[in-house]
Every structure is written in C-alpha cells, then in structure tokens.
Amino acid sequence: MKINFLWTACLIAITGCDSPQNHHSRIESGETKTEKQLENLNFYGTYEGILPAADCEGIRTALTLNNDNTYVLRSEYIGEKDAIFESKGSYHFINGRLMELAQPSSNEKSYYKILDGSKVMLSDKEGTVNQGVLAEYYILKKK
C-alpha cells in the first residue's frame, strides 16, 4: 500500500514539473503566429471612410497606421464649421486583430479591428463590431 502511494506521489511530481514549461511554449508560439498573420496582412497605411454621427451628416475619417506603432487619426464633421480634429498617438494589439489607439495628451482610447489587409472597423474594447444594417458604415477602407 505504501509503495503504491509512493509511486503515485512520484508520478504526480514528475508530471507536475513538466507541464508549465510546455504550456509556456504553446503560448509563445500562439503569439508568434498572430504576429506573423498581421505581418502578412500588410495593414500599414491610410484607411478612409465616413462614420455615422447623430448630430451631423457623418464624420469623414482618415486613420494612418505607421510601422513604428504610431497613428494619426483625422476626423472631419461634415457640414459643421471648424469641426476638423486630428489626434496622434500609439497603437498596440490587444487580442489578435484588435488595436487599441491611445492618445497620450488626453488618455482617450479608441478601438479598431483589422478585418483584412484593406479594411478596419470601429469596435469596442472587447472587439465587438456592429453586425446590424449600419455595419458597413463603420468600416474604413485602405486608400
């Protein structure tokens, strides 16, 4: 009985020591895979479109993503006088293709999801995109 218990304890100890290392390498290869997929998309460049707005005809938007993880976001409220805004900051990927754009001067954050190499879509911080009839109006297309 004592021998069976001893063998079981040894087996658990050996197996327990080996698992975290394998789990860590699986996480690293998953991150590497995501990075390679993003590189293959060639998502750097300028994306343009007109986003919906409640108080004007729309917001003409241009988002430029640079390969040094910086961005420029230009927003023009159509039909409004003196309503052009430009923000600059850095972006990083939160989960797969979800980008968080951070503006250092105001601590504001916005989120875009890369759909493919030619389109990004305005999103929330969880990566949820509009699926309704207005979904196409939240897409910016690469110039």
Task: Please tell me what each predicted stretch does.
Residues C17-E86, E100-K143:
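Lipid interaction determinants
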Residues I94-L98:
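Short, conserved beta-turn/loop elements at beta-strand boundaries and strand-helix junctions
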Residues Y91:
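Phosphoinositide-dependent membrane-docking surfaces
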